[in-house]
Amino acid sequence: FSPKVQYKFEYDVHNGQVLDAVIKWNFAGNWNLWFGQTKMPGNIERVFSSQKLQLVDRSLLNKYFTLDRDAGFQLRHKLNLGETFLVRSKLAVSQGEGLNRKAWSSGNSYTGRIELLPFGNFTKKGDYFASDLKREETPKLMLSVTYDYNDNATRQGGQMGNDIAGSTRDLRSIQADAHFKYRGLSFFGEYANRVATDGDAVNDLGEVYHTGSALNLQGGYLFKNNWELAGRYT
């Protein structure tokens, strides 16, 4: 009904579940409010769509530390500083338990992410796919930090992992990533750390939360004939 209101719906036919069901409202200038279930503003590798990965799967860092998808609200803003410098900020309050949870949440997740693009936007949203498919004519860089606090997490990784039957923990996650592209060359690096703030990572029933640290480094070079040499260290 209005170009200021958009929606996205994505259904996983294979597993029979809703992935995205979100409404996006551009309510003022560079401010947007999202409501529904969608990807959280977390590590950059998870934000890449499955069809836009550089390798056949995501890393072990993503497996254990991603915020994945969740249901709730997201407030997003972008700010231009000078001719090229772009700052994007994202805040989220979500149920903290991941995809398609029908029971009432026992505690919420609070997330903040800031993205700095000193050389301006990537070509055609190139910051959200891994390879330099657009062969950036000038260097492009994104530096980002994410903070998440999951209150009374009922799954091993907050939004991911097995359900917790015993005593729960509050989880604090910090993530940082960098993404660079220039003339076929691409690189991104990610760091993640998660701790349980109110007790050991192992609860009274011996259930283990996904805590600790991880590092993921990935890069490649796309030749002009569209063959690419790429690798990863995690």
How does the language model describe each region?
Residues F1-L99, A103-G120, P139-M142, T211, ...:
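Outer membrane beta-barrel
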Residues S105-G107, E115-F119, T123-T234:
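Detector for outer-membrane/organellar transmembrane beta-barrel domains
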